[in-house]
């Protein structure tokens, strides 16, 4: 706690330009199975919405069988294996959530997704290699540099010691690329700790037991799960002491308020993980004083935060069209 307070206090003083990469590995695999060209020819269909919907569906309702089919399809190029398993999961979920009020919007969307998955062409020519993280790190950075009108040829890049990352960086037109041991480089060490904070926060939010749907062991038994109960982030997130509240305020300034560039964050179509994190920072920072924040019960904060997330999602969905 004290360390992160000091870290963000330093960053707040320095006001650095920060780029966060939050690309989903699940979406990467999905994009390597379904052909984007065939999606673009379907009238009224957004490829971004298509990839987002499949990725979110997998993360919400995945069984071991679906995940196994996804990775086997990527490794063997037998992409019909995944499509067939995905269609089976869609049909089971659609049947299970029918008539549940909180699932009505999702029910309608999954009906459309089921139809599209059946129609879209499978990309049979894709490479079976799916270790993507290295290239994406620098693709997002280059997009941010372009937005800021900074030529990569003027950038001396210093990265942590990791050979694959180093090789990927050399494929871009940076002025220079060198590796540094984080123990001997304050810049790399700051980046490491900042990435660790953001990554752990995103993971903790998405894995919160109060907000997650029940796990799916076998998709055919989904109806045994509690599909009716409204999911809200645990109220424990909002039981803040003054020092916690202050840390959120500083983190908001560093990661959100001072990072107004479009490419400050790199995602593809699926963005929920980073959205719920940024929304939490915005929500807590919307209270100017700790005394104002604690006027509301933690359970009420969970409701307000949920509403804020829904509003942010609706705004993001509008960009699909």
Regions found by a protein language model. Name each.
Residues 1-23, 29-33:
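An N-terminal structural lobe/cap that precedes and organizes the functional/catalytic core
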